[in-house]
């Protein structure tokens, strides 16, 4: 018996919605009590220790140029690893907030193609991997600098939220520095600068929204 499952991710003020059919035998084998204990209703909870076994990894590489500061459009390279096995799925972005969308790599996926503001998938097998490139209208000018707002990220199945791993690398023009970040740094949520880039690493359940405020150095 197939059910309809939703795994939703929201990136850079766009809406990548991961929707799938089938492949939920692992869920059906669990008892009602086990499911109730494991389900997160949506409240953000950072995981100080990564869970055992493969977890959906959502990696984002963002490039902000001088042109981005004027237009709000940034370069985006995004990869999904350890996707759940499903018959059909799609990643849907918000209309008008994504352009030049293309699939750059796929593994253990029978077919992957762009359709409008979405990426359609068929035959997603175990240990699947998908990479895309696009331009995203994600940067917002403010009086005191710029805001890069991402989220909410979530891995949703039926009525529950499950562990997810999100990483991000942000490359910005010289003279632009990170002024603040939300949520605050804590176990399970790290933000740091290395090799001239900003890096974010988050292990969590529920819904995650990140806000990176950037400002010009004097």
What do these predicted regions represent?
Residues 73-77, 86-88, 127-131, 163-167, ...:
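Intrinsic-disorder/low-complexity, polar/charged segments enriched in Ser/Thr/Lys/Arg/Asp/Glu/Gln
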Residues 28, 39-42, 85-114, 160-188:
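Solvent-exposed beta-hairpin/edge-strand motifs
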Residues 51-53, 62-73, 90-92, 121-125, ...:
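Short, solvent-exposed beta-strand/turn "edge" segments of beta-rich domains on protein surfaces
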Residues 20-67:
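N-terminal, polar/Ser/Thr-rich
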């Amino acid at each position: 018996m197939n059910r309809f499952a939703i795994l939703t991710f929201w990136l850079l003020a766009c809406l990548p919605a991961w929707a799938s059919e089938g492949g939920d035998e692992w869920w059906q084998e669990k008892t009602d009590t086990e499911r109730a204990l494991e389900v997160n209703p949506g409240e953000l909870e950072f995981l100080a220790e990564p869970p055992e076994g493969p977890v959906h990894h959502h990696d984002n590489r963002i490039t902000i140029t001088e042109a981005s500061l004027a237009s709000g459009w940034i370069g985006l390279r995004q990869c999904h690893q350890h996707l759940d096995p499903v018959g059909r799925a799609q990643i849907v972005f918000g209309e008008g907030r994504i352009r030049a969308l293309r699939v750059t790599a796929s593994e253990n996926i029978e077919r992957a193609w762009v359709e409008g503001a979405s990426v359609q998938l068929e035959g997603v097998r175990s240990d699947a991997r998908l990479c895309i490139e696009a331009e995203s209208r994600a940067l917002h000018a403010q009086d005191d600098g710029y805001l890069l707002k991402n989220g909410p990220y979530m891995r949703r199945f039926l009525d529950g939220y499950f562990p997810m791993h999100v990483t991000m690398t942000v490359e910005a023009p010289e003279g632009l520095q990170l002024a603040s970040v939300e949520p605050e740094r804590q176990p399970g949520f790290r933000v740091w600068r290395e090799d001239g880039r900003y890096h974010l690493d988050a292990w969590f359940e529920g819904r995650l929204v990140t806000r990176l405020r950037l400002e010009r150095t004097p």
